[in-house]
C-alpha cells in the first residue's frame, strides 16, 4: 500500500478515540500536523531528524529549528517555516518525478539547507521565519498568512509568489459540515476566498479571515429565516 503522511496521521487520530462525536470529528478534520516519522510515499527525508547540528555548523540553527518543531503547520511556527522552505527548495532543486521512494542523504539535506539559508537571508533578512511569513493566501489585493503544507490533513500546496514567498494554489477549499441532531439539520460552511468571482463584489474575498482561522459560518435552508435576515431581496432579471 502507498500510505502517506495524511493517511498515517488520520489513522493515528482515529485510533486514539473509542468513539468520535462531532467535536472530535472537527478536531481531526482540522488537524495540521505531520506524523512521526514523516511518511511521504515518494521520498524519505527522515535523515534530517538524525543529523547532529554540531556536524553541520553552517546550518545548525535550521536543523535545530526543524528537529525541535512539534510538526504543526501553524502560521506562527518557525519550525514549520524552516521546514516549508526546506521542502519547497528540495522539490525545486533536487527532486525529480522519475524517482520514487527516494531516500535523501544527510549530505544532500545539508546542501539543501545551505540554499534555504541563503534564501532566508536574501528575502527575509533572518533565519527564523514563521510559516505565515513565507506562505500566503492571496485573492485580489488581500494577502494573509495561511496554515498547512502538502500532505497534512489540512493540505496546502503552493507555488512561487513574490519576494521569496509562496502562494497557496491548491488544497483546502469549500468545506461543509453537517450535523443531524434533535434540533434538525445543522450546517456550517466556509470557502477559501469568497462566494463570488466578481472582483467588484464584497464577497470576492470576504471569507478569507474566517477560513485562515479554521472558522465557519452557519447556513440555513429555512426560507423564513433567510428572508428575515437577508440584507437585500430582489428578483433576477
Residue ranges, per PLM feature:
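C-terminal/peripheral segments of proteins
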Residues: 1-43, 49, 55, 61-237
Amino acid at each position: 500500500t502507498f500510505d502517506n503522511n495524511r493517511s498515517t496521521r488520520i489513522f493515528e487520530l482515529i485510533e486514539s478515540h473509542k468513539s468520535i462525536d462531532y467535536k472530535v470529528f472537527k478536531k481531526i478534520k482540522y488537524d495540521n500536523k505531520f506524523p512521526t516519522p514523516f511518511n511521504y510515499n515518494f521520498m524519505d527525508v527522515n535523515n534530517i531528524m538524525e543529523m547532529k547540528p554540531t556536524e553541520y555548523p553552517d546550518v545548525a540553527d535550521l536543523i535545530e529549528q526543524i528537529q525541535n518543531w512539534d510538526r504543526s503547520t501553524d502560521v506562527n511556527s518557525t519550525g514549520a517555516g524552516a521546514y516549508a522552505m526546506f521542502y519547497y527548495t528540495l522539490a525545486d532543486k533536487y527532486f525529480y518525478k522519475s524517482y520514487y521512494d527516494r531516500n535523501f542523504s544527510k549530505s544532500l539535506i545539508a546542501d539543501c539547507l545551505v540554499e534555504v539559508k541563503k534564501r532566508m537571508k536574501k528575502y527575509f533578512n533572518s533565519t527564523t521565519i514563521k510559516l505565515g511569513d513565507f506562505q500566503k493566501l492571496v485573492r485580489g489585493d488581500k494577502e494573509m498568512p495561511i496554515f498547512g503544507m502538502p500532505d497534512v490533513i489540512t493540505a496546502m500546496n503552493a507555488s512561487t509568489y513574490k519576494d521569496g514567498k509562496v502562494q497557496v494554489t491548491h488544497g483546502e477549499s469549500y468545506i461543509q459540515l453537517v450535523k443531524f441532531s434533535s434540533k434538525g439539520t445543522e450546517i456550517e460552511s466556509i470557502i477559501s476566498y469568497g462566494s463570488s468571482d466578481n472582483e467588484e463584489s464584497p464577497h470576492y474575498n470576504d471569507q478569507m479571515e474566517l477560513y485562515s482561522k479554521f472558522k465557519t459560518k452557519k447556513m440555513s435552508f429555512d426560507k423564513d429565516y433567510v428572508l428575515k435576515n437577508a440584507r437585500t431581496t430582489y428578483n433576477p432579471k
